[in-house]
């Protein structure tokens, strides 16, 4: 998988630089997200692993994407098809999002809770994480009933486990040692 990231990085960098230059980063992220989803389609995955000519593959891919891709997005697809790299579009999207987060000094923070959190709770978590990470944060909230109560917060390789499940697990570990 790291090979895909290595292959995807230059495409993501080129797309990001182009998007910044033309002030349409949101549009490019949407195009890449759509194209990445298309590659996950079972029929498209078969086409990508088949022996189609690059021009045919690019034309088919662009036809499936329809108006979701502008001319520049179509050009990226053509270049990637010529180089046999359409399979790495999900990794291109991931790298693009990473570059965007770095440029905007934002961090993706995943918050997992047993129940939906109130706006006030989300605001407190956002403020605390912005202070701790020294950057703006974007919360992605998930609900997982196995958490029982409390929250688990993940930001990059940092995990803050304030869940009842986590506390019970730590208590169990202490009692077993």
From Swiss-Prot:
PROSITE patterns: ATPASE_DELTA. Keywords: ATP synthesis, Cell inner membrane, Cell membrane, CF(1), Hydrogen ion transport, Ion transport, Membrane, Transport. InterPro entries: ATP_synth_OSCP/delta_N_sf, ATPase_OSCP/d_CS, ATPase_OSCP/dsu. It is found in: Cell inner membrane. The keyword Phosphoprotein does not apply. One of its GO terms (cellular component) is plasma membrane. The keyword Cell membrane applies. Its main location: membrane. It is a peripheral membrane protein. GO terms for molecular function: proton-transporting ATP synthase activity, rotational mechanism. Pfam families: OSCP (PF00213). PANTHER family: ATP SYNTHASE DELTA CHAIN. Belongs to the ATPase delta chain family. F-type ATPases have 2 components, F(1) - the catalytic core - and F(0) - the membrane proton channel. F(1) has five subunits: alpha(3), beta(3), gamma(1), delta(1), epsilon(1). F(0) has three main subunits: a(1), b(2) and c(10-14). The alpha and beta chains form an alternating ring which encloses part of the gamma chain. F(1) is attached to F(0) by a central stalk formed by the gamma and epsilon chains, while a peripheral stalk is formed by the delta and b chains. NCBIfam families: ATP_synt_delta, PRK05758.2-2, PRK05758.2-5. F(1)F(0) ATP synthase produces ATP from ADP in the presence of a proton or sodium gradient. F-type ATPases consist of two structural domains, F(1) containing the extramembraneous catalytic core and F(0) containing the membrane proton channel, linked together by a central stalk and a peripheral stalk. During catalysis, ATP synthesis in the catalytic domain of F(1) is coupled via a rotary mechanism of the central stalk subunits to proton translocation. This protein is part of the stalk that links CF(0) to CF(1). It either transmits conformational changes from CF(0) to CF(1) or is implicated in proton conduction. This is ATP synthase subunit delta. It comes from Enterobacter sp. (strain 638). The gene is atpH.
């Amino acid at each position: 998988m790291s090979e895909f990231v290595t292959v995807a990085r230059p495409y993501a960098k080129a797309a990001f630089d182009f998007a910044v230059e033309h002030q349409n980063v949101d549009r490019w992220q949407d195009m890449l997200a759509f194209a990445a989803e298309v590659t996950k389609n079972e029929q498209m995955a078969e086409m990508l692993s088949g022996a189609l000519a690059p021009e045919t593959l690019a034309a088919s891919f662009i036809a499936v994407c329809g108006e979701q891709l502008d001319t520049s997005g179509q050009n990226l697809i053509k270049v990637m098809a010529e180089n046999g790299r359409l399979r790495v579009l999900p990794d291109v999207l991931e790298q693009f999002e990473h570059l965007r987060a770095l440029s905007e000094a934002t961090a993706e923070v995943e918050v997992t809770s047993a129940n939906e959190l109130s706006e006030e709770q989300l605001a407190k978590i956002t403020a605390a994480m912005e202070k701790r990470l020294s950057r703006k944060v974007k919360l992605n909230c998930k609900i997982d009933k196995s958490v029982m109560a409390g929250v688990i917060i993940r930001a990059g390789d940092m995990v803050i486990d304030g869940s009842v499940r986590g506390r019970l697990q730590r208590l169990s570990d202490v009692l077993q040692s």
